[in-house]
Design a protein with these regions (language model features):
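Alpha/beta-hydrolase fold catalytic core
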Residues: 1-62, 86-88, 302-323
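Generic structural signal for small/hydrophobic residues in well-ordered secondary structure
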Residues: 45-47, 54, 65, 84, ...
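Conserved HGGG/HGGXW glycine-rich cap/lid loop of the alpha/beta-hydrolase fold
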Residues: 50-100
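Active-site loop/oxyanion-hole signature of alpha/beta-hydrolase fold enzymes
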Residues: 55-57, 95-133
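Conserved hydrolase catalytic core segment
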Residues: 127-170
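A catalytic-pocket lid/entrance helix-loop region that shapes and gates access to the active site
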Residues: 158-194
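Conserved serine/cysteine hydrolase catalytic core
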Residues: 202-277
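Catalytic active-site module of serine/aspartate enzymes centered on a nucleophile-bearing elbow/loop
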Residues: 271-323
Length: 323
């Protein structure tokens, strides 16, 4: 009886192992197929043993750098980037592991990401100063960048950005994401981080579809979550007063008074800071109301150029300003 149970157990283990190996192989082959069918729109830049995907359009200075929220990629800026390209150079990029970028070293904290971005810009011939746009968790990245490299930052636009005083509960599932993504379970179930492909700008949907099930993307997003407390500590140790304009864009839908106070606090990082409310938006403003984000970027660009621009100017149709 015990021998039979032992054989059954070993058989089940063998079956599970075989399924896992098949899943890993399928995930790997499918990822290669997707990337080969749809190459990246930008270029891959080596930043020290691994490459980051950088997609630049437009001309002019200062350049604008777009950093997406958790699980997001350069495709999340599909409605914003073409409009910004009308008045200056604008570059969206994929953080290490995300989109078309190679997997990067852990931990994926804001300081490491900011350091990688600085290297990316230097190796791409974009020395700065640049206008940095951070959405959601990427707000931490651009704030650390501006603090660590003040001479390279011309201004910040924080888009419904995370705040260090907000709750940071890490889902227990995050610890299993690397394994589950590697064996292809998320691809099988059709589960992906970031925005639904159909909600993105039509011009970028094919790129999002090609990279949405990459195991490296799930792993990078989980790594950022698992090390969020380290990131928060890094942010708390940054400069509390910045000598550059800081425009904070926040969505009105679903936002409570606590969140609004945190957004106002971020606007107070600079004497030339203000809070702009996107009245028709939830958390994902670059998709819900991209014009509000574009207008905020335009304002910071004009200030950086020395033009007469009111730091908190905005259209009555797109947003409400709180000074």
């Amino acid at each position: 009886m015990l021998r039979w149970i032992r054989r059954l157990f070993m058989g089940l283990c063998g079956l599970v192992l075989a399924i896992a190996i098949a899943g890993v192989t399928w995930q790997w082959l499918a990822t290669r197929r997707d990337i080969a069918a749809t190459p990246p729109p930008g270029r891959l830049v080596d930043v020290g043993g691994y490459r980051l995907h950088l997609w630049c359009t437009g001309d002019g200075a200062p350049a604008v750098i777009l950093d997406a929220g958790l699980g997001g990629t350069s495709t999340g800026w599909g409605f914003v980037q073409p409009e910004v390209a009308r008045f200056t150079r604008v570059c969206s990029y994929d953080r290490a592991g995300m989109g078309y970028s190679d997997h990067g070293p852990s931990p994926r904290t804001a300081r490491r990401i900011a350091s990688e971005l600085a290297e990316l810009l230097a190796r791409s011939g974009i020395p700065g100063p640049v206008v940095l746009v951070g959405e959601s968790i990427a707000g931490f990245n651009v704030r650390v960048f501006a603090s660590d490299h003040p001479e390279r930052a011309a201004g910040l636009v924080l888009v419904d950005a995370s705040h260090e005083d907000d709750a940071h509960d890490v889902p227990g599932m995050a610890r299993f994401v690397p394994l589950l993504s590697t064996i292809g379970l998320f691809r099988l179930l059709g589960v992906s981080f970031g925005q639904r492909v159909e909600s993105l700008a039509p011009s970028v949907r094919r790129y999002a579809q090609a990279t949405r099930f990459r195991a490296a993307g799930y792993q990078a997003a989980a790594d950022e979550l698992l090390h969020i407390e380290e990131t928060v500590s890094e942010v708390r140790n940054t400069r509390r007063t910045l000598a550059i304009p800081v425009l904070v864009v926040t969505g009105a839908r679903g936002a409570d008074e606590h969140w609004r106070r945190l957004q106002q606090d971020e606007a107070s990082l600079s004497e030339r800071g203000c809070l702009i409310t996107a009245q028709q938006s939830g958390h994902v403003i670059p998709i819900d109301q991209p014009k509000v984000v574009v207008d905020a970027i335009r304002t910071v660009v004009e200030i950086a150029r020395g033009q007469e621009a009111a730091p908190c100017a905005t259209s009555q149709q797109t947003g409400q300003v709180v000074r």
